[in-house]
Amino acid sequence: MAKLYFRYSAMDAGKTLDLLKVAYNYEDRGRKPLVLTSAIDKRAGLNKVKSRIGINQDAYSLTDRDNIFEFVENYNSSNKIDCVLIDEIHFFTQEQVWQLAEIVDELNIPVICYGLRTNYLGQPFETAALLLAIADTLEEVKTICHCGKKASFNMMVQNGKAIKQGNPIVVDDDSLKEIDTKYVSVCRKHWKEGVYE
């Protein structure tokens, strides 16, 4: 029986790397995964997912206006798929999360979502909150803070200072480097204190 999975973490924990590993394992066994990502995240270019260590794979980039259920149903009618893997789920909508549940329930295809639980303001992404409520299986992908504790928060650092206000969605791409901005995964204590190294 198919399930809806949510694998979440702070940034730099290896979510995309895990997605690529799962896709490889399916393909290595003669199965067909369908890899989807958000068109908002253009770090690897459109129609591609790429881990921070450089491994990449072709994918379909979807917008928040796309009906994922219809996309998967149409794709599956001509290319039998065994699993749907979604990177950057936090950039999708709650309606699309319900469409993913429909893929599991109506098409009996497992769906594995990878994404952030919270933004750099410490607030949950709406899609993450919904997935935490409705996913059949929740799995935390763990990483560590500079202090050695588990990192569960994302901190935006600009010109050496922690940022705690602004647009909740800022994509980590090359444009941030131009304004000396980066994201750092930290524990709750260091997120509250604004300490990132």
Swiss-Prot record:
Coiled coil: none annotated. It catalyses: thymidine + ATP = dTMP + ADP + H(+). Its EC number is 2.7.1.21. Belongs to the thymidine kinase family. The gene is tdk. GO terms for biological process: DNA biosynthetic process; thymidine metabolic process. One of its GO terms (molecular function) is ATP binding. Keywords: ATP-binding, Cytoplasm, DNA synthesis, Kinase, Metal-binding, Nucleotide-binding, Transferase, Zinc. This is Thymidine kinase. GO terms for cellular component: cytosol. Pfam families: TK. Its main location: cytoplasm. SUPFAM superfamilies: Glucocorticoid receptor-like (DNA-binding domain), P-loop containing nucleoside triphosphate hydrolases. It is found in: Cytoplasm. The active site is at E88. Homotetramer. Zn(2+) binds at C145, C147, C187, H190. ATP binds at S9, A10, M11, D12, A13, G14, K15, T16, D87, E88, I89, H90.
